[in-house]
Amino acid sequence: MSSRVCYHINGPFFIIKLIDPKHLNSLTFEDFVYIALLLHKANDIDSVLFTVLQSSGKYFSSGGKFSAVNKLNDGDVTSEVEKVSKLVSAISSPNIFVANAFAIHKKVLVCCLNGPAIGLSASLVALCDIVYSQNDSVFLLFPFSNLGFVAEVGTSVTLTQKLGINSANEHMIFSTPVLFKELIGTIITKNYQLTNTETFNEKVLQDIKQNLEGLYPKSVLGMKELLHSEMKQKLIKAQAMETNGTLPFWASGEPFKRFKQLQEGNRRHKL
């Protein structure tokens, strides 16, 4: 369980909701793992056709909690082996577990993007099959190079596939935000132009229910499996490449230094 993430089932919907708007829905590593566990739970429920990611407040999620990341660097490490083992356990394993849960998910993944999403949270948005935006103030930011490491949780695949290689190069290399005008038609399929997040969340569910009328449920899931098959294989392959690529950066200590600067207000994202 998490105080920042909850879930409930509503007919064909398994709804996962971020519920800490006071802290811009920032998440710990345990929260990301919990979301992955909920995806597995949704997979096992026959009546569920859609897994829906919702949020609350003005931000979808500001990404990982600075304090949670910096906590991983606490304590003395006596050897290089101990340091790497600790990082594999605390960072590499959760990243692989979360990315794999999204890659192999059988239900249609829908994201109700109510506001900006940053870091690993933005990576989850990019992994969804269908993304709806509340209004045109949303953006995605993948500040990995600004934080001292490289692409994680499938972004080396999702962004190149959905935004195109040149745009992905620019945003990933320079850690610049992907604004609404570029997201619409690539990652976002529809903009609801609403101001209230709860109204937006409910409207998306109503529209999906209406669109489901007359459809054969097994065809819905079969279509997801067919359309996602190529992406699924690419994501599974990317997990090893991304994890092995980013681990040396974490081992160098640079990301911890930069997260601490963010926490102390001495570093900012390019918003």
From Swiss-Prot:
Pfam families: ECH_1. A motif (Peroxisome targeting signal (PTS1)) lies at residues 269-271. Pathway: Lipid metabolism; fatty acid beta-oxidation. Its EC number is 5.3.3.21. GO terms for biological process: fatty acid beta-oxidation. The active site is at E152. It is an enzyme of class 5 (isomerase). It is found in: Peroxisome. Belongs to the enoyl-CoA hydratase/isomerase family. Interacts with ECI1. This is Delta(3,5)-Delta(2,4)-dienoyl-CoA isomerase. It comes from Saccharomyces cerevisiae (strain ATCC 204508 / S288c).
